[in-house]
Amino acid sequence: MEKINIAMAWWWTGWHVFPIKSLIQHIYKHPQYFQKIQKIVRFGEKRSLEYQVFQDLKQDHKSLFFQSIISWKYRRETWFSSRIKNIRDMFKFTYWVLQSIHYFKKHKIHILFCKWWYVALPVVFAAKLLHKKIIVHESDVRSWLVNKIASKYADQVFTGFDWVLPKSTTVGQILSDDIINHTSIKNIPQENLLEWQELTPAQKLFYTDPQKTHLLVIWWSQWSKRLYQNLLQSIDENYSIYQNYEIFIILWKENKNLKSEFSKYKNIHTFDFVSQGDMWLLLKHCDISLTRAGTTSLAEQKLFNLKIVMVPIPWTHDQYDNAKFYVKKHGDILLDSKDPNYQKNMSDIFKKYKDFKKKNSKKDIFWEIQSAKDIIIKAILSTKTWHK
């Protein structure tokens, strides 16, 4: 039986890198999948989180390859400089397609699986010109430009929500198995130093007051510094409200300088970075989240039944549409950072929910995490999909 070579193109921030990592891990957990594959080639930018994560995966799986490429972005801002850059990049686009064609031939790619970011578009054109099969997954309520284009050439289109793209199949989000870690941390007294020292910082923090409402703050590293600063100011001015919470804040790399400011409050616990395994603890034990409105992160939080307060990135349509969907379907809360009363609205929300405790989820979390990946992988490996 001929084995296939798969190309994957995606974006490089955490909640886009981790799903493709999860998809690859899922393949290698199941012999019926990985026995049909000769290699998986990850197309992306080398100086990025995607490269770091992929290199970690490669240590365990020698059939993985990272292919660094130059990428393209269409800028929809109205600034003159953005228009000039778009014109310049359109001339460069031909070169980027040609480099992708070269790498497709080098790695003898049979099929492309892609997501929505600009790094994927030259790769999609290369796949089409070489008559390779294309599978697309769109995670948002409203499709981005790249996937609108890619879906026109795709042999199969999957979405996270209904009615997003024509002729698509709704499978939900691609989520990580690591967020269903079942390690118990109960009944480990601090006096038992050996076991206590084996706990991660996240595990130790859940010996905090269980009667309080647990709030998780999980904005991205990019474009979120002002949000963290606004939250800190709101806490400083309204601590009588926030003292009712145990607050867990993930700062990420670009906001670590705020750690000392948050840490002056005993009920606020900060993390520079959280693994997917520790994310399970945070999602399992927290009641409310304050977050952006990226669909992968929202889906993870809703699996564990959190009440979600969403602050969409103000200049992108997708996050507002995602947030509106969650408001309508789940009764979650949209907090607009462009509103002049943003900080007051935020403190009012947390005053209202200071005694809130979530109900335990009755969902089959394991099935929800596995099903989308199984459907997509079976489509990738189907001989009807890729075999000429």
Predicted features and spans:
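An amphipathic, basic-hydrophobic alpha-helix
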Residues: 76-111, 129
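C-terminal alpha-helical cap of glycosyltransferases
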Residues: 348-355, 367-388
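Acidic donor-binding loop of glycosyltransferase active sites
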Residues: 109, 284-297, 306
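Active-site-proximal region of nucleotide-activated glycan assembly enzymes
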Residues: 129-206
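Conserved nucleotide-sugar phosphate-binding/catalytic loop shared by glycosyltransferases and other
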Residues: 6-9, 13, 33-92, 269, ...
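An aromatic- and histidine-rich active-site surface loop
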Residues: 48-51, 111-130
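Donor-nucleotide binding loops and adjacent catalytic segments primarily
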Residues: 11, 78-79, 188-189, 193-288, ...
